[in-house]
Regions:
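PP2C/PPM-type serine/threonine phosphatase catalytic domain
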Residues: 1-200
Length: 200
């Protein structure tokens, strides 16, 4: 799901981690189409935090429904996945990236099912970025669309860890434009992938 620089990041275990969320409707829209979830799961494996942000697509019907539905479905899958880990050995073998992708795929299916039953919501979708952080300092990230993950540290400052699925990112990847042109590009809001828009 993520084509970014590195989906697995080590955060030193002695460092303090802060998890939080804030959402603001902004000055353009009347409805906040964002939905955020922070889960803390504990078991035989220790403790993991699962973070998810879904940004309903502006201008599309029921973007706020898509983001809420996606986050709810992803969280259900993730809780179920970790509840099956009864011993630490199974946790060590758990592929966090596939756990995240499984949640995203389920969210995609649920949004498509919702739109098939509610034609007025046709075309609704959401972008998403999610991460699993375990108590050993392992961080795994997945994203769809242009929702981003950043790591902030004293050593490296603020570093973007995901790559957008967008028209402008495609131009950057082909070296057709530079970073400055990307920031001001007239098509910078066109995304190429989203949760809930196609079966794949």
């Amino acid at each position: 799901m993520n084509d970014g620089p590195d989906t697995n990041i080590d955060v030193p275990t002695g460092k303090r981690r802060i998890f939080g969320s804030i959402s603001d409707v902004g000055k353009v829209r009347e409805t906040d189409e964002d939905f955020v979830s922070v889960l803390k799961l504990s078991g035989a494996f220790g403790t993991v935090h699962i973070l998810a942000v879904a940004d309903g697509m502006g201008g599309h019907a029921k973007g706020e429904v898509a983001s809420k539905l996606a986050t709810k479905e992803m969280c259900k899958v993730w809780v179920e996945s970790f509840s099956k880990i009864a011993v630490p050995e199974l946790f060590n073998e758990t592929d966090f990236e596939s756990v995240l992708e499984k949640g995203i795929k389920k969210a995609n299916e649920e949004i498509l099912e919702y739109t098939s039953k509610n034609p007025e919501a046709s075309g609704m979708g959401t972008t998403s970025v999610c991460a699993i952080v375990d108590d050993r300092g392992r961080v795994t990230i997945a994203n769809v669309g242009d929702s981003r993950a950043y790591v902030i540290s004293d050593k490296s400052g603020i570093r973007q860890e995901t790559k957008d699925h967008s028209f402008v990112q495609g131009l950057l990847d082909k070296n057709e434009i530079n970073e400055e042109e990307a920031r001001n590009h007239p098509n910078k809001n066109i995304i190429t992938k989203a949760v809930g828009l196609s079966p794949s």
